[in-house]
Amino acid sequence: MKFVHQREHLNEDDLVVIECSQLCNIRLMSDANFRSFKNGGRHTYHGGAFDRFPAKIAVPSTGFWNITIDTAGRKLDSHGGRKTTFTHSIKIVRRTSTRLS
């Protein structure tokens, strides 16, 4: 599965704000869960399928977090079977100062 990935050190209550050009799955995962996700295994995450943007996910605890965006399972558009253009942005709204632990 193809996906966009970004790893960030985030603090509790920071907000991950996603803009996307189409319906997508957004996951906020720990390193261990991201490894499982990459390998097709069971994983837990914060987020889900979003069709309204900006999507906002609050960070549950301070640490390193993996943000993924994918459009798995989305249908081709009606323009001759071509895929729609996928654009996205990931912004972090810091509610506290960054502290590497």
Predicted regions and their residues:
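Acidic, Ser/Thr/Pro
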Residues: M1-S101
